[in-house]
Structures are given as C-alpha cells and as structure tokens.
C-alpha cells in the first residue's frame, strides 16, 4: 500500500488545478471587474474601465511562470524534486515586484502559489513514506535472516530513490541492531544524517537531512 502513495504526482495534479483555477479567476474578473475590486476591498466604479489588455497581460505572465517554473519543479518521469527551479521562481517573482511599474504584474503575482513551501512539505512527506516502505522490507529481512541487511541492495527488491538526488537513500546499520536511513533533503547535501532544528524547536526543512532512525527495544528483565 505504501508503494502506491505518490505525492509527487499529487503535486503535478494540484499545480495544474491551481493554474486552471487562476485562469478562470482572471476570466471572471475580466467579465466582472467588481470581483477584482473584492481582492483589494475596493468597489471603485472606475474599476470597470480596466482594459482587457491588462488582464490578458497578467494571464500571460501567470501561465509563463507555471510553464517555466511550477510545472517543471517536480519531474514525474525522473521522480525528482528540483529545488533550484523553486529558487529561480522566487527570484523571477521578486524581480517582477521590484520593477518601476509592478502594477502591471500584480494580479498574476497574487495568483501564484509559493511552490517552494509546498514542495518542501511534499518532499518531507514523500521521503517519510519511502522510509516507512523501506523499513518494512528491512523488518521482513530481519524476520527471515535474524538480522538487518548490511546494505539495501541485499533486500533484493526494487526500492524508491531519494527524490532530491535520484540516488538510493543512505542506509547505515550498526552492530547493536540499530540503523539510520536518510535522504539529503532540500539543501541537496549529504549532512551525514544530521537533523537541524529551527529556533522554535521544530524541524528545519531547509537544512539538514531527512532521517528515519531505528532503535531496538529491550524488554525489562523478568518479563
């Protein structure tokens, strides 16, 4: 069942829906400028004089950002998440808001999702699903051979790869029956299985690795 959970494809579907919904919103605002005024809590009668070309310009800008960035951020065929595209997306969006006349692009900017924040969470969740799936195979191997394998290839079954690198997850067993399984996470750097915490004590999803740890539980004496 875990093998059937593909959150990367879920991202693909959701971002296409996001794009369609944004295009529909612009079409509706073009037909009824009062809807545009609702975005700014402004019912100025002059809104009806906004030229169609302005809406068309923002619609083109919106679709450019989706085609060039948000729809390329997750590569379904390669099963990869590409953070560099999210960085480029943010730079382009920031550059547009700093132009001399940012009003030209304001509507498209308002209707674009924060793909980096969405994808960081998808990457975390998909990695967790992958780790749980691999952990199940590790336990099945242990039931059969009385110990965990020395390396993942000993499992002799197809396993998911780290979506941030396209390479196998890092697996580090030890002599005490413990193991560590991790992916490199958003920074795409192997930090040796290091988990980084944010200032509020939560997991820092921008830095460090995404780690699954197993520690065998020892029964108390007498049980």
Please give the residue ranges for each predicted region.
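Short acidic linear motifs
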Residues: 1-223
